[in-house]
Design a protein with these regions (language model features):
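Conserved catalytic/coupling modules of large nucleotide/cofactor-utilizing molecular machines
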Residues: 1-159
């Protein structure tokens, strides 16, 4: 079944929320902070999880790419505090690369969904799991480092 859980004041560490989450096989955590940036669906990839994200279920490649995506977003979250104070130009070359790839990845993971087309005036697009994995892998590997991140927003697949 699918359950909606109200999280008081967006506090995922609330004892009642923690108790409920322990019974769930998967959790998609929606974030106001991500939604404020215009990223939809506004799923927080660092706080969302699924017990089905297992090598034996999704395969080695999918598992590896998902782990690298989470690792990149985690590093970016750590850098975001520095970026908000000093700006991205004050980061080391490697940290700037991490931040820029994370932004590309965040934009790529936006979805032009069929169910939201009447709200955002964007035609829905079907994207296969393989296309999503391929796009994530290309961003992680730096193949799209010279691509404007805005071209990845609500795009669907990278062809």
């Amino acid at each position: 079944s699918i359950q909606a859980v109200y999280v008081p004041a967006d506090d995922i560490s609330d004892p009642a929320v923690v108790a409920i989450f322990s019974y769930l096989d998967a959790s998609l955590v929606l974030s106001r902070k991500i939604a404020e940036k215009g990223i939809y669906p506004a799923i927080d990839p660092l706080r969302s999880y699924s017990i089905s994200l297992d090598k034996d279920i999704v395969g080695e490649r999918h598992f590896r790419i998902a782990a690298k995506v989470k690792e990149l977003f985690q590093k970016y979250e750590e850098l975001s505090h520095i970026i908000s104070i000093l700006g991205i130009d004050e980061l080391s070359r490697n940290d700037r690369l991490i931040a820029k790839r994370a932004e590309r990845l965040r934009r790529f993971l936006t979805q032009p969904l069929f169910t939201t087309s009447s709200f955002n005036n964007r035609e829905g697009v079907y994207v296969t799991r393989e296309q999503t994995l391929e796009g994530c892998e290309r961003i992680l590997n730096g193949e799209l480092d010279n691509v404007d991140p805005d071209t990845l927003y609500m795009r669907g697949a990278i062809l």
